[in-house]
Amino acid sequence: MAFTLPDLPYAHDALAALGMSKETLEYHHDLHHKAYVDNGNKLIAGTEWENKSVEDIVTGTYQAGAVAQNGIFNNASQHWNHALFWEIMGPGEAKKMPGALDKALTETFGSVQKFKDDFAAAGAGQFGSGWAWLIKDKDGALKVTKTENGVNPLCFGQTALLGCDVWEHSYYIDFRNKRPAYLTNFLEKLVNWEAVAARL
């Protein structure tokens, strides 16, 4: 089915006081994400993927080792990734982490802070463009992972609970080359933990 650019669930300037400027959201959502939607729709038109869901397109077109040559996958996966990214952020100080999520993270990582440290390290350590993730694996275990370019947990049968874009366009306007600072700010000020917990 045709991709549709989702509206942001908040105003473009709603995150500005928390470290993500109106300019960043205008470029990132209105231009970058829109380009993935527009290009994806052009590429799937008249193909077997035209009437498939974005999730089916991502899993059906993923080819390990050949992502750079796969335009349909790249645009579909980046559309899916960004739709999640907008959903798990919110205005106001990052909402209090629900007890169930706090408990799950503490049991898995030792503490919520250790999870945040591991997540930030994964994002900072991703060479080049990519994403940092908190995922629920097929066996129900929580893990921190990172992926290159537009690859996402759907490719591996995993459930994405939290994703952070570490492509340079996501942070250069506000943080320049300071990716670690961007990741820390994301975790401490931008994440809507209630939205993350709802994906458990």
Q: Residue ranges of each PLM-predicted region?
A:
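Feature for soluble, non-membrane regions of globular proteins
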Residues: 1-200
